[in-house]
Amino acid sequence: MRSGGEQQAARVALIVWGALVFGAWSGCAWFGRTAPPTWIEGSSKEYAAEQYLTGVGQAESQPEAASRAYAAVSRIFKAEIRAQSKDWESFLVLEKRGTASTERRLTLDQVTNVSTDKVLDNVRLLDTWKDPKSGRHYALAGMDRAQAGAAMQEKIGELDREVQTDLHESRQTQDKLTAVRTLRRALKHLVLREAYNADLRVIRTSGQGIEPPHRVAELTTQLEQVMASNLVVGVDVAGDEADAVRRAVMEGLVREGLPVTAHRVGADLPSGKESEGPPLELLVKGTVRMWMLKVPDPRFKYARWCSDFVIVESATQRVVGAVSRGGREGHVTEAEALARAGRVMQQEVVSDLARTLAGYVYGDTVPATVAPPSACALGLREG
């Protein structure tokens, strides 16, 4: 699948190619039409605003003028989407929590690019003109409002049906993770639907869109409630600097929007006794180690660190994710070398665990079937 940037580049290339073809076809008309067309000043009977949504571009070459005309139309839609995005702010803020898994985030730029790419499929080069005195090129790009509006209505209808399907599945399922995943998917579809609705407002001369069946803010609140009531993550760490690493991991998971329990697994509650509140569904457990290396370096001391973690479904004891990392840090003193190793270990472990766990919870990644090699076993052999 092409990225947004690749799709944009391909579309611009097509516009430029169209400009060249258009210019070859209409070249004689350029030199016969010395007076500038009325659309250069923003109004035209031939391309009336009631029927066409247009943008004008000018440049030293015809292809560049056509590309700028296309960009002028694009800016109209992007500006409207950004103006309307405050209505989706609650979910976009939820998506921005943490920094570990940006590849799965739904961002305003992604929403803007996807919806604008769709609507701009209807844009074509309408007219061109070359100033015979200055040699400057002008281009008019635009879309037929009726045709583009019909395409937007169809896409909005598709997304409304997808939202309803996702919500029905989320409410009917007995599986807690499925409830979270389908509700989040419904929200992503709803945000994209509202972006298309913003496009429709631009296309229609009335400025009216289609009323949504659900509000983004309401479903975002539901998602947070479902997460809090159906999912709890426990963290259990053993080894060197275990308490510090455990706190860092818990803080990192909270930043991801994941509900984390402060109870130590197996320590606070007797075996077989149920805790108050939701049951523990996922457990992050692992071991961390740090030790000094014997390196013949008169200036620096070196400390090695390693970590081996698994993410386990508590009910089935099935491993759904694993993270093994290791590294070496140096400094002039042993204390500073160990301190630096501890800081780096926390940063890397938290980042990987947050990304792995969030990917599993939200259904963005397939659970690992084979655990990676033990970083601590490898490190101890090397050290």
Which stretches of residues belong to each language-model region?
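N-terminal segment of the mature soluble domain
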Residues: 70-91, 230-285, 315-319
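Bacterial N-terminal signal peptides that target proteins for export
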Residues: 2-16
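Bacterial N-terminal signal peptides
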Residues: 13-25
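Surface-exposed short loop/turn segments
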Residues: 91-126, 266-319
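A structural "domain/chain start" motif
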Residues: 53-56, 143-144, 152-157, 164-256, ...
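Short secondary-structure boundary motifs at beta->alpha junctions and helix caps
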Residues: 48-64, 166, 172-174, 313-360
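Intrinsically disordered, low-complexity charged/polar segments
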Residues: 35-46, 75-142, 363-376
